[in-house]
């Protein structure tokens, strides 16, 4: 009887094991080999010392994260002075990668490789504070899953690819502090964007107009050579919180603008903006930073606490043309 029970128990255990799904292998050989090639291409830096064939599970390595299936889905290398060379083409072998961050790597140089398009699951791409140079490859727009792209503080040149406007999931684009030239592509200041930062470049021409109701919250186009009208950015219904258009050559009438109630930061200084300071600006209780200096604004200032509470500096050096000088600012 006992032997029969033992036999039945053994059978049940065997069936249970056979029916159980096979456990995913953490860090498959293809991922490990790709990481080792990346390390070699970057000069075998001490920063990546844990990347070793002696360690079976690359999911435990520094600067690496894996998903539930055991695939490498996040590589982040930052603040390393011993990383040298170009962005390795071997990165393309990490086919499950969702996030790639190469940040504060002064020894990283060369172009952005077109092979990144093989990363069809990539959502977050950061290549920032490096010496990466050359043009932004148009092929990046083939990565349809991209949600956030940060290519700031590099030495990138040439235009912003028009194809960036067609990325269906892109919510944040940061290209500040490069050497980019040309116009802002039509459709980039619109739609699904929540944050668009293109400051400290050499961009020219008008800001492409779009009157769609969108979710954009942050626009920083400062320190470029942009011209024309930017008043449409403040259209009714836009939940915009931060706008920095300073140090351009923008020319539009400020008088009748109605600013969104969510606005917390507004810098329009060093342009050719004209008109008067609208009363709607004085009503913004959330506004923390304001600068309208070095324009062509005329007076008087609205006699409301919401304007004067920022002090007089935000209104300095306005050369009014054809009207009363901008005055009436007296701090108590």
From Swiss-Prot:
Protein's UniProt name: Polygalacturonase inhibitor 1
Underlying gene: FOR1
GO CC entries: extracellular region
Cystine connections: 27-58, 59-66, 298-312, 298-320, 320-329
One GO term of the biological process aspect: specification of floral organ number
Chief subcellular location: secreted
Keyword field contains Secreted: yes
UniProt-annotated glycosylation sites, renumbered to this chain: 131
